[in-house]
């Protein structure tokens, strides 16, 4: 295997959130098609236009080395989303933490386009892969939660670049190259993509068979699929560390889990992990999860960030959304929309297609934007002051970034 040759089948990609939460605002993505040669790598940052009414999180901007002024010159929402679609379609997405990928689809449906992650061939979470390499391979230590700290831990990138999304992508590439070089079988197994993952899950579901799981939180154990739905699979999971405490999980297409046949738990690996495999299998065979399934059904919706968006639609909302997904312009049919959906359309139009607003609508949009800014302003400035106290006073790049963050609201 030549790890230095380009492989167009996958793409290194990091979402760049500018607000907290799985439904927060996405400010940019940084990506590179899979040229493994770090020295020649040229990451590309694509920013999305940030409307005036949305104040980003200063700590998120600072942590990623992103000036808010770059976002003011980004692509409008639908153009941004269509560009990401070109990047991820029919490719494996290689990222650090799969938990951030739903932001891409939340962003897509907010501008009335289809979710993008299902168009990919699958997800490789390098953080999860590093956990698996520690459990099943020869990696001496598991990863840390933060990409930057893990890059230091594995000594894969020693550049002196200032903090930036582009630097973070280079660190991701460095960890990816290390894992592919030293743990190629694991990496290549994940390159089989979503089709292989679904095949193993289907096998478990149809045969009530236990299989292995390394999840995105770095837990290793066995599981059995109990229920298959459009939103994902409900599984019974038993961790290596707690063989007497089974619990339910929901697995969907946003996860970077490593799912494999039970045979990966060889006798030697079980001894090294301190895993009582036979005890776990016995617990699984005797456990009746039916009492938990009904209660879990409502909770599991929290794992799907798009659930709230789609579940609240009426028929007119759905018709508007379907039309807008497949046309350059949004639908003109808005009279029968629900009030909540109508507000979404109004704010989107004000954010990205302001010329379509009447004078009265424009005044209303300006009023709503001002209210939004005033609501968030004090928290924004407080967060910025905390950054000043934490910053390295001897680092001019940090000082310049904080100054740009502090001055941003006054520029609006």
Task: Map each language-model feature to its residues.
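Substrate-recognition/cap regions that form aromatic- and gly/pro-loop-enriched pockets
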Residues: 279-382, 386
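Active-site-proximal helix-loop-helix substrate-binding element of RNase H-like nuclease domains
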Residues: 48-72, 123-169
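Acidic, Mg2+-coordinating catalytic module of metal-dependent nucleases/exonucleases
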Residues: 92-98, 107, 138-195
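Short, flexible loop/turn elements at secondary-structure junctions
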Residues: 15-17, 51, 99, 128
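Conserved DEDDh/DEDDy metal-dependent 3′-5′ exonuclease domain
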Residues: 59-136, 276, 284-291
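Acidic two-metal-ion nuclease catalytic site recognized across multiple nuclease folds
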Residues: 177-278, 282, 376-412
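Signature of the SF2 helicase/ATPase Hel1-core->accessory helical subdomain module
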Residues: 30, 43-48
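Entry/capping segment at the start of metal-dependent catalytic domains
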Residues: 1-40
């Amino acid at each position: 295997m030549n790890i230095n040759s380009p492989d167009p089948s996958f793409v290194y990609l990091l979402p760049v959130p500018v607000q907290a939460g799985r439904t927060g605002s996405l400010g940019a993505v940084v990506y590179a098609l899979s040229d493994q040669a770090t020295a020649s790598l040229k990451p590309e940052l694509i920013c999305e236009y940030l409307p005036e009414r949305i104040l980003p999180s200063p700590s998120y901007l600072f942590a990623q080395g992103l000036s808010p002024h770059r976002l003011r010159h980004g692509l409008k929402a639908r153009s941004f989303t269509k560009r990401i679609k070109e990047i991820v379609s029919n490719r494996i997405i290689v990222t650090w933490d799969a938990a951030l990928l739903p932001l891409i689809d939340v962003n897509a449906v907010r501008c009335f386009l289809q979710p993008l992650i299902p168009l990919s061939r699958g997800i490789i979470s390098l953080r999860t892969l590093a956990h698996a390499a520690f459990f099943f391979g020869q990696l001496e230590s598991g990863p840390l939660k933060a990409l930057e700290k893990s890059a230091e831990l594995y000594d894969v990138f020693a550049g002196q670049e200032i903090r930036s999304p582009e630097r973070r992508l280079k660190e991701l590439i460095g960890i990816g190259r290390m894992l592919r070089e030293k743990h190629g079988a694991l990496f290549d197994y994940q390159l089989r993509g979503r089709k292989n993952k679904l095949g193993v899950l289907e096998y478990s579901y149809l045969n009530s068979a236990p299989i292995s799981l390394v999840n995105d939180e770095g837990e290793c154990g066995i599981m059995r699929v109990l229920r298959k739905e459009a939103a994902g699979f409900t599984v019974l999971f038993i961790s290596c560390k707690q063989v007497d405490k089974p619990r339910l999980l929901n697995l969907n297409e946003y996860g970077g889990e490593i799912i494999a046949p039970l045979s990966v738990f060889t006798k030697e690996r079980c001894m090294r992990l301190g895993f009582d495999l036979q005890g776990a299998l016995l617990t699984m065979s005797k456990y009746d999860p039916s009492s938990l399934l009904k209660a879990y059904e409502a909770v599991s919706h929290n794992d799907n960030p798009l659930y709230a968006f789609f579940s609240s639609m009426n028929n007119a909302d759905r018709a508007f959304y379907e039309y807008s997904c497949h046309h350059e312009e949004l639908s003109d049919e808005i009279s029968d929309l629900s009030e909540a959906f109508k507000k979404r359309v109004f704010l989107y139009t004000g954010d990205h297609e302001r010329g379509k607003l009447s004078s009265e609508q424009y005044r209303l949009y300006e009023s709503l934007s001002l209210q939004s800014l005033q609501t968030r302003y004090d928290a924004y400035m407080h967060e910025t002051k905390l950054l000043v106290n934490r910053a390295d006073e001897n680092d001019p790049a940090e000082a310049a970034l904080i100054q740009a963050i502090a001055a941003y609201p006054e520029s609006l």
